[in-house]
């Protein structure tokens, strides 16, 4: 009896998964974002002056597991804009659900919030760093940079976080090396780990 119930439950679960996959294929990105937003209890909200859609499209083109979802436009004229203006954009960055709000010039981005992107090698580190900085962004120290909308990013090779987590002399050497860098140099961090 239990075995039969378990098999029926597993079969039902697989059928639901298949239905979701078919809906995603049939409805495209809308179904994916609808499914994601129904699951998310916490969404990062980012305030942009006016370019939330451009930012979301850039992130989707730059990072894996990233996409643009629903775009909401003003249904009528309002004090800060006109009918048809983009008000909000739903998007994901590396699987993290986000919500871009075109709120005007009142609040600026700061380093108090940043995305930290873990990378596996120098090529991946360079790719993300160059995409952000080369698209109107700005370099900072210790693996930090800003995109052209002022959002801060930490492009962090795993070798650095592993070295810092090791503690002791290895962590000190890696930390001291990191403090001299803008974009993280993986080979230099590996050399510092070895001493």
Which positions does each model-derived feature cover?
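Short, flexible turn/loop "capping" segments at secondary-structure junctions
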Residues: 34-40, 107-109
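C-terminal cap/linker of serine protease catalytic domains
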Residues: 169-195
């Amino acid at each position: 009896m239990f075995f039969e119930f378990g098999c029926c439950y597993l079969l039902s679960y697989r059928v639901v998964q298949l239905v979701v996959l078919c809906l995603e294929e049939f409805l495209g990105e809308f179904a994916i974002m609808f499914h994601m937003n129904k699951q998310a209890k916490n969404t990062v909200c980012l305030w942009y002056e006016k370019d939330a859609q451009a930012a979301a499209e850039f992130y989707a083109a730059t990072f894996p597991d990233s996409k643009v979802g629903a775009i909401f436009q003003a249904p009528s004229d309002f004090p800060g804009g006109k009918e048809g203006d983009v008000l909000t954009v739903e998007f994901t960055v590396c699987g993290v659900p986000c919500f871009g709000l075109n709120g005007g010039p009142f609040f600026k981005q700061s380093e108090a919030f940043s995305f930290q992107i873990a990378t596996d090698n120098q090529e991946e580190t360079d790719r993300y760093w160059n995409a952000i900085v080369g698209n109107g962004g700005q370099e900072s120290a210790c693996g930090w940079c800003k995109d052209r909308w002022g959002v801060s990013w930490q492009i962090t090779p795993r070798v650095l976080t592993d070295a810092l987590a090791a503690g002791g002399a290895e962590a000190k050497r890696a930390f001291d090396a990191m403090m001299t860098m803008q974009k993280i140099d993986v080979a230099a961090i590996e050399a510092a780990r070895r001493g």
